[in-house]
Amino acid sequence: MKPKMKYSTNKISTAKWKNTASKALCFKLGKSQQKAKEVCPMYFMKLRSGLMIKKEACYFRRETTKRPSLKTGRKHKRHLVLAACQQQSTVECFAFGISGVQKYTRALHDSSITGISPITEYLASLSTYNDQSITFALEDESYEIYVEDLKKDEKKDKVLLSYYESQHPSNESGDGVDGKMLMVTLSPTKDFWLHANNKEHSVELHKCEKPLPDQAFFVLHNMHSNCVSFECKTDPGVFIGVKDNHLALIKVDSSENLCTENILFKLSET
């Protein structure tokens, strides 16, 4: 005869079960949750000639949110965490009078140029102080540069200007970013850049690969009447100018001659 086995079943009352479930629920909701949010405040600085510089300094704000418990109520805590700040500088060309110029604001992290990173790029037509257009023509498998009068219905050639921060300190004759002068490269077509030939005192179009040579960089000066001038990086005091309806390198002896018409140029979106 088999012995009888007794089993006991502990019953949990409805009220007690609800209390247990509440405790478990409180434990789950008590866990913290972290979310990262990027914050990018913008700063503006107006330079002497009217050139407006916009800087954007980004950091991440990590928000720690503690979920509310049923007993203590809602608790909320925030703290800031600085992380991998990346600064972006954008040049607004109000000084040139070309605020409508098509602007490329894509991030340019081109580290191929030693110690220099491009700030931004603009696509614009280039003309002289007397409103003659700078044009480019392909002749015998090479590009020629002309200075000529165009008819009203003729389309102007465009040049891609890439802006860089130079190592030269800014002064009263020009504007800069963070105390440094701006440099530009000028490219009318892919893989071709304006190049200063100091030996021949000429301006030529050369096909170059990055890193670009120093002869392709020009220090930018903002002059009166919404004009700019381009000084050779490799030969200070020598500027891009106009001579016999062609671009040439012109020596400027003193700062008083920086306003000479044959070294002044205008930038326009049309």
Curated annotation (Swiss-Prot):
Keywords: Chromosome, Cytokine, Cytoplasm, Cytoplasmic vesicle, Nucleus, Secreted, Transcription. Residues 1-94 form a propeptide. GO terms for cellular component: chromosome; cytoplasm; extracellular region; extracellular space; intracellular membrane-bounded organelle; nucleoplasm; nucleus; transport vesicle. Pfam families: IL33_bt. InterPro entries: IL-33, IL33_C. Induction: By infection with the parasite H.polygyrus. It comes from the Eukaryota. The record marks F94, A95, I98, S99, L108, H109 as: Cleavage. Expressed at high level in high endothelial venules found in tonsils, Peyer patches and mesenteric lymph nodes. Almost undetectable in placenta. It is found in: Nucleus; Chromosome; Cytoplasm; Cytoplasmic vesicle, Secretory vesicle. Its main location: nucleus. Changing E144K: Decreases affinity for IL1RL1. Residues 64-111 are annotated as: Interaction with RELA. The full-length protein can be released from cells and is able to signal via the IL1RL1/ST2 receptor. However, proteolytic processing by CELA1, CSTG/cathepsin G and ELANE/neutrophil elastase produces C-terminal peptides that are more active than the unprocessed full length protein. May also be proteolytically processed by calpains. Proteolytic cleavage mediated by apoptotic caspases including CASP3 and CASP7 results in IL33 inactivation. GO terms for molecular function: cytokine activity; interleukin-33 receptor binding. Gene3D superfamilies: 2.80.10.50. One of its GO terms (biological process) is negative regulation of T-helper 1 type immune response. Belongs to the IL-1 family. Highly divergent. Forms a 1:1:1 heterotrimeric complex with its primary high-affinity receptor IL1RL1 and the coreceptor IL1RAP. Interacts with cargo receptor TMED10; the interaction mediates the translocation from the cytoplasm into the ERGIC (endoplasmic reticulum-Golgi intermediate compartment) and thereby secretion. This is Interleukin-33. It comes from Homo sapiens. The lineage of its organism: Eukaryota, Metazoa, Chordata, Craniata, Vertebrata.
